[in-house]
Amino acid sequence: MTEYIIETKDLTKRFGKDVAVNSVNMKIERGQIYGLLGRNGAGKTTTMCMLLNLSKPSSGEINLFGEDYRKHPKENYSKIGSIIETPGFYENLNAVENLKIIAKLRGNYNRKTIDEVLNLVCLYDAKYKKFKDFSLGMKQRLGIAAAIMHSPELLIL
């Protein structure tokens, strides 16, 4: 039997009378790349927020790594890296300082790892530049660095 990294059954999200996500069923296998496509307002971001436990489903099931996401939320979500539409970096801190905060919150601060991910996303030479002075592309790459810094099993972009 295949163990899915993500599996949803009839995942639904309502905001009052409005249905933002209606009975989404998906099965995502480990090592695969999937895309969630749709028009504006189709519920893509809402679905991602439910998968990341940032928003609770109105009904339906979410299984992560083969079990109900509510059973071991801290354990399961430590295996996930994500990039949300507006990353929450501190404007007056540089790239290293911002990543250091994230690493410490996750309990895995390692300066060498920070340097490695900054190099990987081509921000090593800008590591002491303040976030507010980054271009949009640099901000997005810092978001990628933050998402991959702890070597997640699942990356949601």
Language model features with spans:
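Walker A (P-loop) phosphate-binding loop of ABC-type ATPase nucleotide-binding domains
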Residues: 39-43
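Conserved ABC transporter NBD signature motif
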Residues: 60-71, 75-76
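Conserved ABC ATPase "signature" region
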Residues: 100, 104, 111-126
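Hydrophobic anchor residue at the start of the ABC signature
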Residues: 144
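Catalytic Walker B motif of ABC-type/P-loop ATPase nucleotide-binding domains
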Residues: 155-157
